[in-house]
Amino acid sequence: IRLSSLRIESDEVVIERLSELRGIGRWTSEMFLMSCLKRLDVFSVGDAGLRRAMRYLYQLHDPSDADLVALAEHWRPYRSVASWHLWRALDNHWIE
């Protein structure tokens, strides 16, 4: 895979292509989209930190993936930015 060619692909195509590589799954591909390709509208529902932050923020006990995805829809087109803020809040112990 030529990583430079991924810049022009959709998020789902990038995830699909990277996931073909051994040891790379959806979460890693989503982090690549956010960190390397600077995509602003990625939400990684499988990220443990985001799940914990959203449970705290929205006072949820055991939300499903669908619940979290639906809540994150309100953050479009900046779901990556919202995610960065939630990670920062966790890192700084602003939320439990």
Each model region followed by its residue ranges:
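Catalytic cores of DNA base-excision repair glycosylases
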Residues: 1-96
